[in-house]
A protein has these predicted regions:
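Short edge beta-strands and adjacent beta->alpha junctions
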Residues: 2, 7, 11-451
Length: 451
């Protein structure tokens, strides 16, 4: 590995609302996993919720937008005073030209990207989104040409506010959700080389992955009913046909109504997934078409029963996504990361700037953000860049972990939401690039509190 470059991310003061100060958090920042449900589908063949103008949405250089109601759908409460943020999977379907999609609270500025896509490409990404004016989310489909694109939105769960009050009055155990337990990332399934499941997943088939009690590379998930959700990075590896994959808590009967990963034949692609754990302690992975190998990298689990006075594991969304890294810009060095190289970034200044009504939220152990490889460049002008990957992990790790956050291709932007754990010192992360020369971008959506 080449010498590491230390950098500091300096962020302006960030503001957050809805969550009160320490000691009064209650259910604030706790997660309530839901069985995945599709709450929006603009395709003409779908009868699921759409908004005017009906059908494929406008795409173009004028940043066309539409607004989507987040509250009261798919199991999310209807009251904005109860809901801090919502976890969704957003998919752009067959856009007519190259572009990118942004998602942000209605009424807030949209200055970041969630999805980058080529003409005709169907691609999803996970997002932690806050409702804006009227509890709505604004989606913008940007492109260099005027065109159209369909959009799908699947709700995965929601984060409660400190004022959330449901169930038995005064019974916090009944009102509260789950905390995010961030682990050292580890690969628990790799169908290519054994990995507990030594064969590809076939068409219309599902595979049961035992999550409670899973163990790999020193990371172990408790085998306990209090583990109610999983945060995993699912990677499909070279399917033999264009396909989609879905992760659900219960063994599917037929084709699931939601999707987590859409991928073209022969490609390698990842997507971060938040999913409830089923009563059997497992999650179930479905493949629609062809045969595909797949990887499951565990990033965290969701566990109930935390002390109400503790802060650890609460997820606090930012007012809107914040661009914390963009190595294309001089402010972050303007130099791509080379092959088999890594570099460090300290998020101490960023973490110190996150506040609620002017009061710092305190110690943080991780962030959730959209990581984008802006397109890998060649090592030699006459030799194509090999497909590769980016891995982001705590800078104090002894070695690069055997996981990946996203897979890279020459000159093709690739996004994926990432849970990034900080090192114990200076809240520093390390970015490793496998092949070619890579510029990358990180738009932060939320932070994870520590005690």
């Amino acid at each position: 590995m080449a010498a590491l470059i230390a950098g500091v991310v300096v962020a302006p003061t960030l503001t957050i609302s809805t969550v009160t100060a320490a000691g009064e958090l209650g259910a604030g920042g706790e997660y309530h996993p839901l069985t995945p449900a599709r709450i929006f589908d603009s395709r003409p063949t779908s009868s699921i919720n759409d908004v005017a103008p009906l059908g494929p949405k406008n795409q173009g250089p004028s940043d066309p937008t539409f607004d989507l109601q987040l509250l009261g759908l798919g199991g999310v409460p209807n009251s904005s005073s109860d809901v801090l943020a919502v976890s969704v999977s957003i998919t752009v379907v067959h856009p007519t030209s190259i572009g990118y999609l942004s998602a942000y609270p209605t009424g807030a500025p949209g200055t970041s990207s969630l999805l980058n896509f080529a003409a005709g490409q169907t691609i999803p990404n996970l997002a932690i989104v806050r409702g804006g004016t009227g509890g709505k989310l604004t989606i913008a489909i940007n492109g260099s040409k005027v065109g159209k694109a369909d959009v799908l939105v699947d709700v995965l769960g929601w984060f409660s506010s400190s004022t959330y009050n449901a169930g038995t009055p005064g019974d916090l155990a009944d009102e509260r959700g789950a905390r995010l337990v961030v682990v050292d990332p580890a690969r628990i399934v790799d169908t290519r080389n054994g990995g507990g499941m030594p064969f590809p997943l076939g068409p219309g088939a599902q595979r049961t992955v035992q999550f409670r009690g899973a163990s790999a590379a020193g990371t172990t998930i408790p085998n306990d009913p209090s583990v109610v959700g999983a945060l995993i990075n699912l990677t499909a590896v070279e399917p033999t046909a264009d396909t989609f994959m879905a992760v659900v808590p219960d063994q599917p009967v037929g084709e699931p109504a939601t999707s987590n990963l859409n991928i073209s034949a022969g490609r390698v692609q990842a997507n971060l997934v938040m999913v409830p754990v089923g009563a059997d302690g497992a999650i179930h992975i479905y493949n629609s078409a062809g045969n595909t190998n797949f990887l499951v990298d565990v990033m965290a689990y969701l566990q109930t029963g935390a002390d109400v006075e503790s802060r650890k594991g609460r997820v606090i969304p930012l007012t809107s996504p914040y661009r914390s890294l963009d190595t294309r810009q001089v402010a972050w060095g303007g130099v791509p990361l080379g092959p088999a190289q890594a570099e460090d970034w300290s998020f101490a200044a960023f973490a110190g700037s996150v506040n609620i009504a002017g009061v710092a939220v305190g110690n943080q152990l991780a962030l959730l953000g959209n990581l984008t490889n802006a397109g890998t460049a060649r090592q030699s002008p006459n030799v194509s860049a090999e497909p590769g990957f980016l891995t982001v992990f705590p800078a104090d790790a002894a070695a690069v972990p055997n996981i990946s956050n996203l897979n890279t291709y020459e000159l093709v932007p690739v996004p994926n939401m990432a849970l990034i754990k900080y090192s114990a010192a200076n809240q520093t992360v390390r970015v490793f690039n496998a092949t070619g020369y890579a510029h990358y971008i990180l738009d932060v959506s939320a932070v994870v509190l520590a005690d």
